[in-house]
Amino acid sequence: MSITSLKNQKEFELINKLGKKLHERYFILVIATKLPKIFLESKYNTFLGIKVSRKLSKKAVVRNKIKRRIRHLIRIIVSDSSFKAIKFAMIIIPRKGFEEINFSHLNYELSKVILRNM
């Protein structure tokens, strides 16, 4: 399973427009399964965008740690065999408290939301 990141503002706006917005306690997830031609022609199956606001933390070190955790969570979730044939894109926006919650709980919450909306 190959994952790539959303590269520019146009891609983020496209997913925001086409995707379904899901508000959870620790994050907001925008997920789009019906992708435009730009994404369908790509060799990648999963497109990931991460938005970490300065409101979450003023320190870049903390924001980067949050991004690393999200990337790792997505790698774990997408490595599941049920995602092999599906092309989808998502944007994850962490909320306050995301950095304090333990990894296994985040994994459970995120996988539950993604699987429910595929």
From Swiss-Prot:
Keyword annotations from UniProtKB, A to Z: Endonuclease, Hydrolase, Nuclease, RNA-binding, tRNA processing
Catalytic reactions on record: Endonucleolytic cleavage of RNA, removing 5'-extranucleotides from tRNA precursor
Cellular component GO terms, alphabetical: ribonuclease P complex
Its job: RNaseP catalyzes the removal of the 5'-leader sequence from pre-tRNA to produce the mature 5'-terminus. It can also cleave other RNA substrates such as 4.5S RNA. The protein component plays an auxiliary but essential role in vivo by binding to the 5'-leader sequence and broadening the substrate specificity of the ribozyme.
EC number: 3.1.26.5
Domain of life: Bacteria
Organism: Rickettsia peacockii (strain Rustic)
GO molecular function: 3'-tRNA processing endoribonuclease activity; ribonuclease P activity; tRNA binding
Subunit structure: Consists of a catalytic RNA component (M1 or rnpB) and a protein subunit.
Record-stated family: Belongs to the RnpA family.
InterPro entries membership: Ribosomal_Su5_D2-typ_SF (IPR020568), Ribsml_uS5_D2-typ_fold_subgr (IPR014721), RNase_P (IPR000100), RNase_P_CS (IPR020539)
Pfam families the record matches: Ribonuclease_P
GO biological process: tRNA 5'-leader removal
Primary enzyme class: hydrolase
Protein name per its UniProtKB record: Ribonuclease P protein component
